[in-house]
Amino acid sequence: CPAERLAEIKKGHDLIVAEAENIKKTAMEVAEKLKDKIPVIYASGSYEALAIRVRQQFNENDKKLSWAGALPEMNHNELVGWGGGDNRFGVVFLNTKDLIERNQKRLEITLNSIGMKTDTVINLEAKGNSKIEKTLYLNSVLDWASLYIANLNNVDCIEVEIIDYLKDSLAKI
């Protein structure tokens, strides 16, 4: 129902406003941990779109390759790839605290396994009661984190020369 969704969005907005200072503080803590890392963003399947959005923010704002995956799907092949993982990678799990018990255990085992390969594993807990509130909260934290990382790395988050090059090249076809 649209009215219910609007009410949830309003609650999400109110949460972000109320938590603004905490969001920025948490974002800076995340940024400091990921500053020199390749960000890897994981979420439960129902929050995969958020993980992708966060990956894109790291791509665009810090001009940094990143990737995103979702539990339990990443446990099929990607977890094997962590056999070659190392400290170049920094993992952020978007923890919405609403996993079923089996998937919560899966998360703990997965993060422990990945933690054997990299020293940076961040279990970022959402605030909020609804999926919309949790999504808006985590999105805000990590949007700020991507901007803070760009600043820490002296990267111009506005610059998009490679996109301009692509557009100019395509215009000549």
Language model: regions and residue ranges:
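A SIS-like phosphosugar-recognition module
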Residues: 1-173
